[in-house]
Amino acid sequence: MKRTIIVAGSAVLLLGSLAACGKGSNSNSSSSIAPSTTATASVPADPAQTATAPVTTPEPSVVVPEQPTPSPSSSPQEEETVAITYRMNKAYRIVPIDKEKTPSKVVLLTFDDGPKDEATLKPLLDTLDKHKAKAIFFVNGYRVKAHPELLKEIDERGQVIGNHSWDHIELGKEKADKIEEQLGKVQDIVKEVTGKTPVFFRPPFASSNDAVRQIAKNKGLLFMTWSNGSLDWDMNKVAREKRPQAVIDNVMEQLHEGSNILMHELAWTAETLDNLLTQLEEKGYSFVDPRAIDLTA
């Protein structure tokens, strides 16, 4: 914002007049739900008060030259630009657009059904940071409503938020108006909390129909299911202490280039994620940034 300070003296000098001198300052600060904010030094504002000085010999008027307009600074919400180098094929695998220039030995990490609780979410985020990995967190609207602070944390930690419907219902069994509501409400609440609108969509249970796909497309959402299921959600018959290793075993058995790996915000997944990512790296895999995926596929 350009602010100009002009101290104006009297145009006509009169003997015995009072000399006026204004002093004042104003500092503004702003806050946002964006991932981070940048403080900006305040510029003195127009004089707010006028004090009466002793009678002195009148002084000539003084005009402070107009300050130059400062160069605009980058917005605190500005994100790193990521080149579009991958696309999703019909099997929901992530493949390079240019196979000669872009590695094909990558996996896409995704986590469904959050945000649930800090105790599970924080270890997931910490592990992703440790491996410099990005993931899509497909969230449910009713959970975002209960824990907006957790959604904000996902965003502030640099991860990507996807739409997973409001109530986690089988959308393939619903009519268009219900589908519209389920997707639209999630778009709205994520935008309200983070200032960003999701661009990825995964239907719960992979349940879909033509209306689901069309409505998702109308909202600018890239529809996907997965190509590698960790089965971390299907552990009722697995002893608790064996579940972390079972997640790794399931992923490794289905591993392929471009794996679109489905996981959830579950305790055993959080416990084993570091080990899983380490093993993937040892096999030569890297983690694709979701922002590098072409949304027009």
Give residue spans per PLM region:
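Alpha-helical scaffold elements lining the catalytic groove of polysaccharide deacetylases
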Residues: A119, I169-T194, S207-H256
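Positively charged n-region of N-terminal signal peptides that target proteins for export
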Residues: M1-T4
